[in-house]
């Protein structure tokens, strides 16, 4: 039976003080959904806006975007100088800043920023021969953005090959070529 054909009425309660939504007989999936709802509610309460409501749709804080870009550029400069640990620090700070965007900002923007930062951090790990860390970052970059991310597909394949996982590397690069098609680098 599909989810659209079935409906269960579940008893839920709202705490009068915190306005948190709970359920007595919550399954794991319901508990996760309620936690996400309560987290969204708490983040909306922290808005510093005279009306107390979130700003209109799709507002992007230009300062945060500029700071994420500046951190990425600083990481790129350190990478070019051969200072790979410093580059990794800048990329990590950029990832952390991008992940702190409010929930109402476009998710596509966050995914774009994250995928680029993680792909660059993977390259810095590769330069230090930290193959496992590079593979993890490249994989996370691909998960954030599948199409148009040929470098991350290749970087994970290279890391897997360097770790002696040749079959996985070949399969990974093959999948990357299927996704990227003729656009792949």
Model region roles, listed by residue range:
Residues 1-185:
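Alpha-helical tetratricopeptide repeat
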